[in-house]
UniProtKB/Swiss-Prot annotation:
Protein name: MARCKS-related protein
PANTHER family found in the cross-reference section: MARCKS-RELATED PROTEIN, MYRISTOYLATED ALANINE-RICH C-KINASE SUBSTRATE MARCKS
Modified residues (Phosphoserine): S22, S36, S41, S48, S71, S93, S101, S104, S119, S120, S135, S151, S162, S165
Species for this entry: Homo sapiens
Taxonomy of the source species: Eukaryota, Metazoa, Chordata, Craniata, Vertebrata
Family from the record: Belongs to the MARCKS family.
In-chain residues carrying the UniProt-annotated modification Phosphothreonine: T14, T85, T148, T178, T187
Compositionally biased intervals (Basic and acidic residues): 76-85
Gene for this chain: MARCKSL1
Amino acid sequence: MGSQSSKAPRGDVTAEEAAGASPAKANGQENGHVKSNGDLSPKGEGESPPVNGTDEAAGATGDAIEPAPPSQGAEAKGEVPPKETPKKKKKFSFKKPFKLSGLSFKRNRKEGGGDSSASSPTEEEQEQGEIGACSDEGTAQEGKAAATPESQEPQAKGAEASAASEEEAGPQATEPSTPSGPESGPTPASAEQNE
C-alpha cells in the first residue's frame, strides 16, 4: 500500500496538503466533526464543567438528574403498577389426540386444568414423539424414516393412523405381539391404515 500522495494525480490536492493549509477551523471542527483532544476549556470563559461531569458545581445548576422521591413507593422500586395487566399467553390446544412415551394426550373441552396445557409439547415435539413411539415398537423402516427430516410428516400421519387402528383393533388383537409394518401382509390393522 502506497501513500496517498504517490497515487494522486499531480494536479489534485491531497488530503494531507488540504489539512496543512487549514489546520483547524475557528469553532474547533475538523472535517465536519468536533475536535476533542481532551482540552475542552473554551477561550474566554472562566469556569467550565469537568469532562466526566462529577463536579458538585454542575449539580448546583439544576442540570443534574435527581432521584425520584420515595413517596411513589412501588413505582420507585421498578415494580409494575397494579393497574397494568401483563399480556396473557395464548393457551395451546391440541387438535388431534396423540400418545407420547406411554402417556395419552387428549383434547380437554373447556376444563380449567391448565396443567396439561402448560406442560404440553409443541407440534414438532408431537411429531417427534409419535415417530419415537413407533420406532420403540420395533419397526426398522419407521426408525430409518425418523432419521431423515423429509419423511417426518408422512411418518407422523402414519403413526397417528397406526395408533388409531391399534385402539380399534385392541379387542380383536389375536395375532402375535410383534408389530406389523405398513408393508406386512393383509391384517385388519394394516388394512385400516391403508384406507
